[in-house]
C-alpha cells in the first residue's frame, strides 16, 4: 500500500509540474501568433484609443479622448499574465477590470467600457494581438520576505 501511495504522490507532482507557466490558459491554447502583426492589429483595431503599451512607441490616446483614462498594458508585473488571461481580457473585458483605475472611468452600466470586438476581430488578429501583448510583459519576482 505504501508503494502505491508513493507512486500516486510522484504522479501527482509530475502532473502538477506540467500545468503552469506564462502560456497556461486552463485548457485554452491557440496557435502561436506573430508579434509584429499583433502590433499592427492593435493599431488597426484602435486599441490605442484607450491603451498604451509599455516599451513601445505607440502613442497614448490623443487629446480628443482626454476623458478616457489611459490603461497601460505590458511592463513589469509581479504576477504572470497568462495566455488565457490575455485572451479573456480581449474577448470578455468585463470578466476582470483593470485594477487601480476608478470604476466610473473604466465602466459603462457596470460593464467594461472597452468596445466589443467579437463580431469584427478575426481569429488571426486575436492570436497575433495576444502574442504582441504577451511579449510586452516582464515578470519581476517579488522581493523575498525577510523575517
Protein language model annotation of sequence segments:
Residues 15-18:
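C-terminal motif of bacterial Sec signal peptides marking the signal peptidase cleavage site
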Residues 34, 43-49, 54, 125:
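Short pre-active-site segment immediately N-terminal to redox-active cysteine/selenocysteine motifs
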Residues 13, 41-44, 108:
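Processing junctions and N-termini across compartments
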Residues 35, 39, 52-95, 101-103, ...:
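Gly/Gly-Pro-rich "capping" loops immediately C-terminal to redox-active cysteine motifs
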Residues 1-8:
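Bacterial N-terminal signal peptides that target proteins for export
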Residues 20-43, 57, 78-79, 147:
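Electrostatic cytochrome c docking/interface patches
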Residues 88, 109-147:
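C-terminal capping alpha-helices of c-type cytochrome domains
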Residues 47, 94-98, 138:
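Generic structural signal for secondary-structure transition and capping sites
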Amino acid at each position: 500500500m505504501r508503494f502505491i501511495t508513493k507512486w500516486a504522490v510522484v504522479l501527482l507532482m509530475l502532473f502538477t509540474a506540467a500545468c503552469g507557466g506564462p502560456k497556461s490558459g486552463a485548457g485554452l491554447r491557440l496557435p502561436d501568433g506573430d508579434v509584429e502583426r499583433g502590433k499592427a492589429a492593435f493599431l488597426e483595431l484602435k486599441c490605442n484609443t484607450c491603451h498604451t503599451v509599455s516599451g513601445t512607441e505607440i502613442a497614448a490616446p490623443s487629446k480628443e479622448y482626454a476623458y478616457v483614462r489611459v490603461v497601460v498594458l505590458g511592463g513589469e508585473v509581479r504576477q504572470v499574465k497568462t495566455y488565457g488571461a490575455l485572451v479573456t481580457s480581449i474577448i470578455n473585458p468585463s470578466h476582470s477590470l483593470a485594477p487601480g483605475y476608478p470604476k466610473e472611468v473604466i465602466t459603462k452600466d457596470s460593464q467594461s467600457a472597452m468596445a466589443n470586438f467579437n463580431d469584427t476581430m478575426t481569429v488571426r488578429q486575436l492570436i497575433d494581438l495576444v502574442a504582441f501583448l504577451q511579449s510586452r510583459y516582464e515578470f519581476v519576482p517579488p522581493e523575498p520576505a525577510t523575517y
